[in-house]
A protein has these predicted regions:
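Rossmann-like dinucleotide/flavin-binding elements
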Residues: 6-12, 16-42, 135, 141-167
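Helix N-cap at the beta1-alpha1 junction of Rossmann-like dinucleotide-binding domains, i.e.
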Residues: 44-46
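Core beta-strand elements of the Rossmann-like FAD/NAD(P) dinucleotide-binding domain
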Residues: 10-12, 105-114
Length: 167
């Protein structure tokens, strides 16, 4: 323990930053390759998919009407089955110099030979009345993902960036 920071003595083969679908897949494949793996996530596992009520466009074996949290729970269990460790922590400093990479948070220091950054994306809520209440129930942040749910409905696109226009 160094100044309130716990040094994790283990040097992992791989540390994955992010426990969304990409991070969990990376952890799964690294674990299946018999590498020591640590998956670090600062928030809720799953990223944006964790707030999705129903998934219909994800490749693979999806249970009819499966929710984002359900799919992420299965993905997490699969990564852990192959040896990936999962820790909730917020990394505040990263040093990718040298053979051993160092990742620091307010409470711990982690080391790995390789780092995979899979921190994902996040939506930018606009803060209008009812937005939080109806997210996933009519308010969507991914037109490509959710367009099928809104067929034959009048929709509004809010945003001025490229993705708002393209979607």
């Amino acid at each position: 323990n160094k100044g309130g920071i716990t040094e994790v003595s283990k040097i992992y083969d791989v540390i994955v930053l992010g426990a969304g679908p990409a991070g969990l897949a990376a952890g799964l494949y690294a674990g299946r390759s018999r590498l020591s793996v640590l998956i670090l996530e600062k928030g809720q596992d799953g990223g944006q998919i964790a707030i999705t009520d129903e998934i219909e466009n994800y490749p693979g074996q999806i249970v009819e009407g499966e929710s984002g949290p359900s799919l992420i729970a299965r993905m997490t269990a699969q990564a852990e089955k192959f040896g990936a460790e999962r820790v909730s922590d917020t990394i505040t400093e990263v040093s990718l110099e040298g053979e051993v990479k160092v990742l620091k948070s307010a409470k711990a220091e982690y080391q790995a030979r390789n780092v995979i950054i899979a921190t994902g994306a996040h939506s930018r809520p606009i803060g209008c009345k009812g937005e939080a209440e109806f997210t996933g129930k009519g308010v969507s942040y991914c037109a490509t993902c959710d367009a099928n749910f809104f067929e034959d409905f009048e929709v509004y696109v809010v945003g001025g960036g490229d993705s708002a226009v393209e979607e």
